[in-house]
């Protein structure tokens, strides 16, 4: 006889509903008005390895091709912009915003390979092609080593700073006893990428100051720095997609040399992995291996810069809308990495003497930013304002939209003579100044508030945009000349008769 039994499997209930994030195309209406904006030539010069301090401050900054360049581009408020058509929107029911539809990052200076290194680099043996290695007995076997680091081209566009990740020293549990010299626990840290932060040069995304106390394991430019790598996973999973609309990336490297580290091996090789040796080979030599990277050949055929890019659909929900009238351009370009060596003599020389010559090194970078922006408008409906307030509460404040305070139900005190010395001072407190939430971070400020132009055909990127959308500029008006009348004085030729 068939008997019905309830299922023994678990029943999974659906998760509680959450507020849905919608794309900006659902509440942003685009117009047919476009503007071009471009920066001037942006230059920076400094020392490629470390800052130089002469009077207690960084008189010569650190400028390296392995630094992030993070441009914070300031845009004018479109609601206070002088528009050609004042009827384009209703200020009582709508607000205007900018949408980035095209950009071009110009790079100057020639292609070049830059070398970085350390005069006291921790290397013991050449493990690629060396003689028989024995146990390290010298207390200091550091050597002068230079490398051409990893080659990187990167560009991240968004209206919020890009997010980076790196490993640093974590906190050990109280139940785990630690002593001096133990391997520290690791912790993955997320932080905004700032202008001047170091990129991954092939030695990992680490806080080298905290994790390598020997100060001899990596080149000079990162030995006391933190190398960050963009956290593409976190930015792609961002609910609103403000930190990364899209990105361009090209990385390449290979290994040039193979070394091992000198020092005491903190974690010995298990005995079952080898057979003991003799003649200074017990215990075995250092098994902490390290490879020096190389960025390989640099060509103009693999350049990401000096060409236009058009934004049709962003990877996230923000389809190029510049909230708070700003956008962030994060750039890395190690293909223009020439470190210029300069020399100056201390006195006039008749014969060459290297002790009378001072050597210097400098690195220079050159940028130019061009954009095409589209004017858009947002309807101030109750649903849209509630959504924007949840996403970013400062937007409504910048648009001079606030909530009216409720009617006071308690009894308030009102003095008759407010300027009398007999009562407490009745002077109103000044409202607190609006604080920039990103003021503690370092960016390269680029002000484009006075650089907007509607004449797109007057700029290189504007002409490329007009060609992209299929709009041709009108030819200049030319005055028509009267054609001179021609009078033939010769007799008309008679037709040849057919025979």
Swiss-Prot record:
Chief location: virion
According to its UniProt entry, what is the function of this protein?
Answer: Forms an icosahedral capsid with a T=7 symmetry and a 50 nm diameter. The capsid is composed of 72 pentamers linked to each other by disulfide bonds and associated with L2 proteins. Binds to heparan sulfate proteoglycans on cell surface of basal layer keratinocytes to provide initial virion attachment. This binding mediates a conformational change in the virus capsid that facilitates efficient infection. The virion enters the host cell via endocytosis. During virus trafficking, L1 protein dissociates from the viral DNA and the genomic DNA is released to the host nucleus.
> Any keyword NADP?
no
> Which family is this protein grouped under?
Belongs to the papillomaviridae L1 protein family.
The name under which this protein is listed is Major capsid protein L1
The record's SUPFAM superfamilies line, in alphabetical order, gives:
Group I dsDNA viruses
Q: Where is the composition biased (Low complexity)?
A: 484-493
Recall the GO molecular function terms of this protein's record. Answer: structural molecule activity
Q: Where in the cell is it found?
A: Virion; Host nucleus
Which biological process terms from the Gene Ontology are attached to this UniProt entry?
endocytosis involved in viral entry into host cell; virion attachment to host cell
Key words of the record:
Capsid protein, Disulfide bond, Host nucleus, Host-virus interaction, Late protein, T=7 icosahedral capsid protein, Viral attachment to host cell, Viral penetration into host cytoplasm, Virion, Virus endocytosis by host, Virus entry into host cell
Q: Where is this region: Disordered?
A: 472-499
Report the superkingdom from the record.
Viruses
Please state the gene responsible for encoding this protein: L1
| Pfam families tied to this protein | Late_protein_L1
Q: How does it assemble?
A: Self-assembles into homopentamers. The capsid has an icosahedral symmetry and consists of 72 capsomers, with each capsomer being a pentamer of L1. Interacts with the minor capsid protein L2; this interaction is necessary for viral genome encapsidation. Interacts with protein E2; this interaction enhances E2-dependent replication and transcription activation.
From which organism does this entry originate?
A: Human papillomavirus type 53
The record's Gene Ontology cellular component field reads: host cell nucleus; T=7 icosahedral viral capsid
